[in-house]
Amino acid sequence: LQIHRAVSAAQSVVLAHSVGHDVQQQVADVLFARASADGRLSASLGGLFPTGAGVTITPHTPTHFNPEEYGMSSVALRRIDSIAKRGIQEGAYPGCQIVILKDGKTMYDHAFGTHAGKGSALVRPTDLYDLASLSKTTGTLLALMKLYDRGRFNLSDKLSDYLPWLQRTNKKDMTIRELLLHQSGLPAGIVLYPEAIDKESYKGRLFSARKDALHPLRLGVTTWANPNFHFKPETLSRTRNANYTLQICDSLWLNKSFIKVIQEKIIEAPLGTKQYRYSDVGFILLRFLAEQLAGMPMDEYLAREFYEPMGLERTLYLPLQRIPKAQIVPSANDKFLRKCVLQGFVHDESAAFQGGVSGNAGLFS
């Protein structure tokens, strides 16, 4: 009777058919999701659990812990709720998810608000987000570390030894180490969209310092834009076909030959001194390097070597190929260039114009 009451009141129960030390250790590991358990009851247990009852636990199953056991305060963590809700009320963001880990243990994991304001989907703990520049360290850098460990390159190697299109340029002597340290002299970024816009399709200038009839769209404090332009038909298409294969939003496909335009823009980019300057361009080049060394697209290499073996099924590039759009939080409402809400498509322009996989951005999780 006492056991019946105890089991009825328990939040979870692990059934083990032995009191041996090894079994006790296995049960402890299951409780902390350090070991797997996938058994099912072969017979009912006194009205408590029916035949076939059971859940599957794997080392990837999320678990929660008492913050006080790790030197943290539950009271202090609960204050985060009010801060997150105030941000939503003041319009700073429509929703968010906040996760706090300590020593690999989940101390706090809560979702707030909606994807895009009133009437849109609620934020869920399993939703995906555009990781933006975190793609550099959680994507590109991982690929290069693996390739380095396999002896495929040295940090002192010149990038042009692997990317021949750089050999007759002022970038021919840049080393891989310089790119990783953001000390190559490359600029912070390159602007690609002017190469896709038909300059004959709009009147006047594309941007203005003040709002007027031609520039109704505000992009910044002193920047107003003319959104009434068309793309070059040889660059972008409203339908997919054999040449237009790189999707950059719901209804725009980029010509796969645009990669040559990107290479030209990198070649033309001015070089500064070898001092620290954070550069997306350097990591765009490192993606080209990773693919050259791996012999396959970087997103496929990362999935094979890291994400799939680690059970990170919801960490990936090009998420719409595997994840329903409703499970991806919108990144932005692009009223100027792509003229749509970006949901499942990378926000970063440089990554978008590479089809969604880039060394500087593109990863979702």
Which residues fall in each region the model found?
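Sec-exported extracytoplasmic/periplasmic mature domains
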Residues: 32-36, 85, 89-90, 145-152, ...
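Short, charged, surface-exposed loops that flank catalytic or proteolytic processing sites
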Residues: 41, 154-156, 294-300
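Short active-site loop at a secondary-structure junction
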Residues: 90-99, 119-181, 269-282, 358-361
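Active-site-proximal beta-strand/loop segments in catalytic clefts of secreted hydrolases
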Residues: 1, 16-19, 101-103, 112, ...
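Extracytoplasmic/secreted envelope proteins and their assembly/folding machinery
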Residues: 24, 28, 77, 81, ...
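Short, conserved catalytic-motif segment at the N-terminal edge
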Residues: 69-131, 152-154, 260-268, 341
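Short, surface-exposed loop or secondary-structure junction motifs
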Residues: 171-365
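C-terminal non-catalytic regions of proteins with extracellular/luminal or membrane-system context
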Residues: 1-66, 70
